[in-house]
């Protein structure tokens, strides 16, 4: 993974214009750092992460990931740079089994099958769930679903990984 900075400048966001969720947020995140966002329930932490990967759009301000400004026109490019693991990992698992789910993203990139198989195998090994490759998604525990979601993002080889509640449902060995 490379060193890609995230730069947020005067970010403002609201679900309803009269009720702002995030106001005048500015920061630069160094590409080599591990950073946590801390705050009370409902403070906008998950919303901020979703804004960073283009799942929501700003009311005003700007976001840059590396040298790419986050805009509707650059979403595909941003999503190759930044991977996102949802708080509820089940939201991003939709294929019949773990292997197919992890392989889905690199297949979508149009990579050759050998590369897809390699990336999938390496991602499953990285989170210690290679033995679950053929297990149906609906039979996974909460922690196994989280690990499968992380493996899915790893298979894409993004420069940045954003994780919402990264250790939720994981046992101490996998945190």
Regions picked out by a protein language model, each given a short descriptive name:
Residues 1-8, 12-24, 72-74, 113:
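A short, flexible loop at the N-terminus of ABC-type nucleotide-binding domains that lies
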Residues 38-40:
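The feature captures the beta-strand-to-loop junction immediately N-terminal to the Walker
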Residues 53:
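Helix-to-loop junction immediately C-terminal to a conserved catalytic motif
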Residues 61-69, 78:
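Conserved ABC transporter NBD signature motif
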Residues 114-132:
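Conserved ABC ATPase "signature" region
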Residues 136-140, 144:
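Conserved ABC ATPase signature
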Residues 161-164:
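Catalytic Walker B motif of ABC-type/P-loop ATPase nucleotide-binding domains
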């Amino acid at each position: 993974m490379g060193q890609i900075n995230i730069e947020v400048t005067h970010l403002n966001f609201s679900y309803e214009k009269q009720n702002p969720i995030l106001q005048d947020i500015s920061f630069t995140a160094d590409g080599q750092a591990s950073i946590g966002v801390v705050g009370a329930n409902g403070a906008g932490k998950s919303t901020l992460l979703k804004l960073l990967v283009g799942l929501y759009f700003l009311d005003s301000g700007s976001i840059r990931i590396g040298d790419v400004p986050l805009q509707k026109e650059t979403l595909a490019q941003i999503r190759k740079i930044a991977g996102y693991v949802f708080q509820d990992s089940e939201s991003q698992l939709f294929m019949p089994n773990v292997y197919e789910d992890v392989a889905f993203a690199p297949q979508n990139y149009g990579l050759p099958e050998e590369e897809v198989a390699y990336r999938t195998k390496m991602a499953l090994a990285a989170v210690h769930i290679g033995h679950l490759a053929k297990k149906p998604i609906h039979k996974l525990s909460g922690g196994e679903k989280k690990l499968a979601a992380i493996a899915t993002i790893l298979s894409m080889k993004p420069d940045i990984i954003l994780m919402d509640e990264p250790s939720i449902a994981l046992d101490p060995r996998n945190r």
